[in-house]
């Protein structure tokens, strides 16, 4: 993410009226979504992104998908979810999860039209807050300007370790593809 966009996004953290607790979405068997604040699962703040800035971000995300993901996964872009600007205060965390599926009644069920997850790190001035992929034995210390993209599926369960000092700022978005990535996921993973 260009520094100019990062600076514009960081200004949003000053508008306390546009901050809310991020929620967890649960989708039932009928496809109905419910949003729940489950602080034991996720302690994250959500910052409202104005429409104009959101549109710029979506163009940038589409370009990054074309540049970095199409050559690796060979899947055409179908749709995206608007970017979310998240803040993790001291103690902020997110338990193990994947971004598209849930295990319910003995089977995996798709709950979101997400195939590629994008994470963009907007600052480095915090402790803790590492991104971990437990099944892959991989832990990443985020740094300002870093982008991480990975399949949104159950094979890529991940979590965010609690922030120990400072405030971790992240931009997240998800892309849906015309063809599912299940058969195109590289053996080397992320």
PLM region spans:
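Fe(II)/2-oxoglutarate oxygenase catalytic core
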Residues: 1-147, 155-190
């Amino acid at each position: 993410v260009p520094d100019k966009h990062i600076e514009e996004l960081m200004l949003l953290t000053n508008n306390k009226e546009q901050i809310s607790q991020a929620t967890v979405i649960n989708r039932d068997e009928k496809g109905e979504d419910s949003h729940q604040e489950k602080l034991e699962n996720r302690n994250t703040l959500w910052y409202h992104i104005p429409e104009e800035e959101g549109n710029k971000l979506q163009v940038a995300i589409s370009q990054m998908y074309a540049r970095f993901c199409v050559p690796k996964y060979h899947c055409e872009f179908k749709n995206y979810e608007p970017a979310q600007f998240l803040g993790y205060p001291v103690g902020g965390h997110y338990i193990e999860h994947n971004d598209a599926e849930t295990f319910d009644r003995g089977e995996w069920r798709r709950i979101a039209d997400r195939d590629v997850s994008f994470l963009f790190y907007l600052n480095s001035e915090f402790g803790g807050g590492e991104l971990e992929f437990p099944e892959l034995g991989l832990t990443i210390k985020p740094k300002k300007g870093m982008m991480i993209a990975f399949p949104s599926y159950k094979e890529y369960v991940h979590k965010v370790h609690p922030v120990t000092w400072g405030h971790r700022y992240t931009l997240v978005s998800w892309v849906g593809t015309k063809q599912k990535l299940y058969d195109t996921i590289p053996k080397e993973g992320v």
